[in-house]
Amino acid sequence: MLAVDSTRYCVLTHTTPQPIDVKSSSLEAELRAILVDKSVCYGNFTLASGAQSDFYVDAKLTTSNPRAALLVGRIGWKLVKQTATARGVHVDSIGGLTMGADWMALSIGIAAYLDSPSSDIQTFSVRKSAKKHGQHKRIEGNFLKGQTVVVVDDVITTGDSTLQAIEAIEEAGGRVAFVIVLVDRQEGGREAIEKGGHAVVPIFSRTDLLGTNAGRRSHIAVA
């Protein structure tokens, strides 16, 4: 979360991204350009942790954009297929903690269906707490006990949101195969998740997205 007072501001960067040797795929290059253009914001911010930041990445401005969602879906599904094959697992469903995972999971699920309708990949969303009415669900959507799932998240920092989703899924009887993230901030989150035995596959790292000149003081914050 992000704390901002009235003297602080965010300006979207509608500029051409600096050339960085990242992924070779043209789809990934286009997605990176959209992320930098739509989601990288600059200002003076105090994060909930108390850390100071002069920029943050609001990844939801990208994952909720139709063109970017198409790219996230195609790239994400490619990574799901490659990683599942390498690890010898069958994936039943894709999801994660709301809201960071929601658009991303659905985009990948749609891409999976378009690529292979017979794969029957489903999607779901993990609430931060169970509903207090109706069926009192914490996991909404297409998830069943005993399924093997891929957890997704738009940005990981400490990994807490992803770990919350993993805990909820495992408590509900699911098996987590691995984790796909859009942006790894490289601030310990990946290591925290992998310490629990779950591989993390990022589409972009902080360095991929912003280069090596982001500055030690700067952090990518989750809005």
Where are each of the predicted segments found?
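Short helix-loop-beta connector
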Residues: A86-V91, L144-G146
